[in-house]
Regions:
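Glycine-rich, basic loop-to-helix element that forms the pyrophosphate-binding segment
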Residues: 68-85, 98
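Membrane-interface aromatic/basic loop that binds lipid-linked glycans or pyrophosphate carriers
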Residues: 1-3, 35, 45, 113, ...
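Short aromatic/hydrophobic "clamp" motif used to bind/position activated sugar donors
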Residues: 90
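Catalytic core of nucleotide-sugar-dependent glycosyltransferases
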Residues: 210-219, 224-253, 266-268, 272-296
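A conserved acidic beta->alpha catalytic loop
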Residues: 42-51, 70
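Short, well-formed alpha-helical segments that are part of the catalytic scaffolds
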Residues: 14-28, 52
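Donor-binding/catalytic cores of nucleotide-activated saccharide
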Residues: 74, 95-208, 213-231, 241
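Cell-envelope/extracellular polymer assembly enzymes that use nucleotide-activated donors
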Residues: 4-7, 37, 193
C-alpha cells in the first residue's frame, strides 16, 4: 500500500442525501486509492451522514471521521481537518459537491510541475441538473504568478472574488505559514478574509485546467439558501478582510478593491433582507453601518461609483446615515 500524497478535507452537516456521491467520486481520483487520505468532519449532523460516509468509503484505505456533538460551523470544521494534514498537498470538498475522475491526480501533477504554493481551477454549478461552467477570473492558464497580481483592478471580478476553498489544491507550506486556517466561529463568508490573506501573503499560484468539480446549488439546507441570523456572519468576515488589507504594506494599492467588494456584498444582502425577520433585518442594517465605518472614508465615494446603479441606490440611505452620525 502506498502512502497518501494528498489530504482531502470534507466537512459536512446533514449531508446524508448527497455525501455518498461525494465520497464515491473521491474514490475515483487516483489509480491507486491509497494515494488519497480523506478526513471527514461530521459537524453535528442529525441525519445519517456518518453512516453514509462509512458505507461509501469502505474500500478507501485512509479515512478518518471526526464527529462534533454540536455544529461548530464550516470554518471551524475545516480547521479541524487542517490540523490533521500530514501530506504534501491538501484540498477541500463540501458534502454536497462532487468531482470528475482523476481531478486530484491532475492537480497533483500541476502542483509538482509548477512548484507553486497553490493552484485554482474553474468549477461547474449544478442546479437541479442544469449545469454551467464558471471560469476562474484570471486569464493566463498554467502560468505561475504572484497572487498579489491577481487582485486588481478594483472594478472587475478578480481572484479575490472567487473565494471557493474547494476550487483548487494547496501545498502544505501554505499551512505551515499560517495561511490555510479560517476565522473560527463564522458560519458564512468564512472564505472572504481567507482568500485575501492567501493572495496577499502566499508567494506563488497558478490557474490550471483540470477535470471538473461540481458545485450543487439550490440545496435547501445550504447556508447560501437560508435567510436567518447566520447570514449576518458576512459582517465580521468582511471586517476581518478589511483589517487584513489594512495591515498589508501595500494597503493603499488594495483598499479600493476591498472597499468595492464589501459595499457590493452589503447591497446584495440588503436586497435580500426583505425575506428576513424584522429583528434580523434590523441587525443587518446596524451591522452594515458599522462595516461602512470600517472602510476608510476616502474610499467610500470611489467604491460607490464602481457599483451598479441599483446597488448604489440600495446603499444610499445607509451611507448618508453613516456620514451624518
Amino acid at each position: 500500500m502506498s502512502s497518501p500524497i494528498v489530504t482531502v478535507i470534507l466537512p459536512a452537516k446533514d449531508a446524508g442525501p448527497y455525501i455518498g456521491t461525494t465520497v464515491t467520486t473521491l474514490g475515483r481520483q487516483f489509480e491507486d486509492p491509497s494515494r488519497l487520505r480523506l478526513v471527514v468532519i461530521d459537524d453535528g449532523s442529525t441525519d445519517d451522514t456518518r453512516a453514509q460516509v462509512q458505507h461509501f468509503a469502505r474500500e478507501m484505505p485512509h479515512v478518518e471521521i471526526l464527529s462534533n456533538p454540536q455544529p461548530v460551523g464550516l470554518a471551524a470544521a475545516r480547521n479541524q481537518g487542517l490540523d490533521l494534514v500530514d501530506t504534501d498537498f491538501f484540498c477541500f470538498v463540501d458534502g454536497d459537491d462532487w468531482m470528475h475522475p482523476d481531478r486530484l491526480e491532475s492537480l497533483v501533477d500541476s502542483m509538482r510541475r509548477l512548484e507553486c504554493d497553490f493552484v485554482r481551477t474553474d468549477h461547474v454549478t449544478d442546479t437541479d441538473g442544469r449545469r454551467r461552467l464558471m471560469r476562474a477570473p484570471h486569464g493566463p492558464r498554467g502560468r505561475v504568478v504572484s497572487p498579489r497580481d491577481a487582485i486588481l483592478p478594483a472594478d472587475e471580478t478578480t481572484m479575490v472574488d472567487y473565494p471557493y476553498a474547494w476550487a483548487g489544491m494547496f501545498h502544505r507550506r501554505v499551512l505551515d505559514r499560517g495561511l490555510a486556517h479560517f476565522e473560527p466561529g463564522l458560519f458564512t463568508a468564512e472564505d472572504r478574509p481567507w482568500i485575501w490573506r492567501l493572495h496577499l501573503r502566499a508567494e506563488s499560484f497558478a490557474v490550471v485546467d483540470a477535470p471538473a468539480i461540481l458545485y450543487r446549488r439550490g440545496v435547501t439546507t445550504s447556508l447560501t439558501q437560508v435567510l436567518d441570523r447566520r447570514q449576518l456572519d458576512f459582517l465580521p468576515a468582511f471586517a476581518e478582510a478589511i483589517r487584513v488589507v489594512e495591515d498589508d504594506h501595500e494597503a493603499d494599492r488594495f483598499l479600493p478593491k476591498i472597499a468595492t467588494t464589501t459595499m457590493s456584498v452589503c447591497a446584495y444582502h440588503l436586497f435580500r433582507a426583505r425575506a428576513m425577520s424584522t429583528a434580523d433585518r434590523t441587525a443587518l442594517r446596524t451591522g452594515i453601518r458599522d462595516l461602512l465605518r470600517a472602510i476608510p472614508a476616502e474610499q467610500i465615494d470611489p467604491a460607490l461609483s464602481r457599483l451598479s446603479d441599483r446597488r448604489r441606490r440600495i446603499l444610499a440611505r445607509l451611507v448618508r446615515e453613516v456620514r451624518s452620525a
